[in-house]
């Protein structure tokens, strides 16, 4: 991770690219990250597909005109703080209809997703991951799932401050946010 030394705004970050890199803004500082690994992308996709399938099933069973919420993958940016600006980008984000029901905006909306999913990369330092979790929770995110492929565990951080570390015999749960959603970690990691 590389951080620039000048203040930048969320608006300046829109359209800012460094070929082959991922960028975030943390308290006005540009943070440049390496591209995600294939394994990282695969796990992000599996979580996203499981959530999308759950929402589609729920909509079909309940015949809702609208889904319960919106789902986004591929590092969607959210403006979590201003002056200095922080724009974080989870691997997967879910926004409930209660939190956000309008059309998807251009740029980075000033809100936090209800669920943020972070898949750890090999180069991620524990302190950096915890700082991201703290940013999500302080901005109003209800659940943060940190998926750790190296250890084959997932850590669940909740808005009420509770934390749970889940192993291969456990499952991620949508809890009250996404009732009925369950994703086995053994299935997620394709463990034997």
Residue ranges and their predicted role:
Residues 1-192:
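Gly/Pro/Ser/Thr-rich low-complexity, intrinsically disordered segments predominantly at protein N-termini
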């Amino acid at each position: 991770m590389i951080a620039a030394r000048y203040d930048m705004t969320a608006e300046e970050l829109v359209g800012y690219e460094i070929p082959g890199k991922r960028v975030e803004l943390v308290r006005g500082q540009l943070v440049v990250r390496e591209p995600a690994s294939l394994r990282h992308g695969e796990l992000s996709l599996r979580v996203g597909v499981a959530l999308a399938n759950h929402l589609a099933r729920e909509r079909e069973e309940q015949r809702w005109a609208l889904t319960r919420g919106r789902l986004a993958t591929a590092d969607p940016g959210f403006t979590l703080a201003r002056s200095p600006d922080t724009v974080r980008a989870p691997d997967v984000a879910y926004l409930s209809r209660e939190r956000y029901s309008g059309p998807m905006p251009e740029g980075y909306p000033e809100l936090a997703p209800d669920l943020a999913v972070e898949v750890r990369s090999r180069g991620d330092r524990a302190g950096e991951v915890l700082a991201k979790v703290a940013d999500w929770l302080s901005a109003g995110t209800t659940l943060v799932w940190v998926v750790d492929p190296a250890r084959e565990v997932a850590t669940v951080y909740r808005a009420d401050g509770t934390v749970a570390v889940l192993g291969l015999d456990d499952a991620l749960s949508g809890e009250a946010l996404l009732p009925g959603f369950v994703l086995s970690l053994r299935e997620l990691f394709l463990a034997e």
